[in-house]
Amino acid sequence: MPGGYFQLIAQGPADLYLTGNPSISFFKFVYRRYTPFSMELINLPYNTIPSFTPTQSTEAKCNIDRNGDLLHDCYVIYDLPAIYTADYPFSWVESIGNKIIEETSIKANGQNIDRQFGEFMKVYSDLTLSSTKKEKYDNMINGSNNIIRTAIPTGDDTYPALPSKRLFIPLPFWHCKNSGQSLPLIALQYTQMRFDVIYTRLNDLFTIGNPGVSPEELFNSDNLSQYNQDMRDTLLAEGWDQTNVIFRFARNWDQYSAILANYIYLGEDERTKFAQTSHEYLITQLQRRIYLGLSRGPSRLDLVMNYPVKELIWFFRNQDAYKTNDWFNFTDNQCPDLLNDVKDIRKFIMTKCLQTLIDNDTCDCSGNGLKQKLNLSNQLSDLLSQSYAGLYEGVSVSNMNSSQWDYYSIMKDAKLVFNGHDRFEERLGTYFENQQIYKYHTGKGCRGLYVYSFSLKPERDQPSGTCNMSRIDTQQFFTNIFDTDNNPKENDKFDLHMFGINYNVFRIMGGIGQLVFTN
């Protein structure tokens, strides 16, 4: 008798809890028939062609045409130009696809239904996407470390130092995530749905190097300052104009942008049912509060949020980041991606300053030109004799030590106080940065990103816990910013960006769609 039969015979009372009165079989596949449908991606042009400028944000409006029965996932299309440079290193900012979008909203007959922000889109993708999904997401928005490349001058202007690239930026509105939440355009006969997109000014989207100082040093294109030091006019390119600087590198840029929308077409029976039936959709919305110019030490802030909130997400940013377009550095360290290693400097993105100690000699590679592993070969003089450090695969070097600050969290601790009572006791920043993300999210987040969840499963559409902020009169957030004794930047100022994800109901009745709960 085969041994497998002996296992089946060995049954006891405990097995009744597992196999008594079974309701499923693992050896008979059961499927469900589905209603017929089809899908098609269609480009939606803006009502007027947006004109992107270096110094001002640009707003574009896009009517959602009823090209299909339902509207599912949508994307912002944006064409990055080819970059030509024979003298100045040029680099797009990290996650430029997210940074391009200052904010975007979906409206019904002019009523704002939901509003999203490019910076939140970046951090939320860090929180919710698996490593595989995040890799593809970064490919679409030009966000991963191996895509953010610096255009090293090539000696002529014939061929682009950086090629052009079309970005596909996923919009995170409620109807884009789950097909069961798709927006029923067929039922909105008397409602004009519209996307509004505010694009970031161009000067916030790139950095350029100054060969008069060092090929690796970068400065902000807007105020032409290098790490808070005014640059001399003699170091600037002839005819340099900060209001038009991007067009020195980008040639014949058509500045194309549009909305890519996935329309769903239903079978006749289901189409009729959708058109004649009232609908109520449980949707998610995003709230944002910004607190500017916080000093080191304790702060007490009023949240002023509304509706049932399932999760709070926040980050701090040193105001120095605005001077170097270092938008997604949420730490108190100029080089958060450079880690200490005894033998090898591993892959990193240089943001401002790196000091490497080799046999007690200092090699100061300042700037943002190093985008891959830094190859330090036998002699320090070999590196210093080069105009550019070689961008090669890094190798372990004997007797070499790298010295760098920890990435310095900005927030030391925090707590919530509702109507004068502690919602939870004061907790360290590492609790919000690590434990909360580990327990409630799929992704790993990023350094300096903090989370507090009221929900058991905040990533799912099914609600599993909220805090109704509308019923709490006084909402206070107490936080404490590190004041480290050995930190030379003790007078720095910080901005806090606080986001709350809440639920609301979008009701469609008589061809008109509107929110059920409004302030």
Region roles according to the model:
Residues M1-N519:
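Short, low-complexity Pro/Thr/Gly
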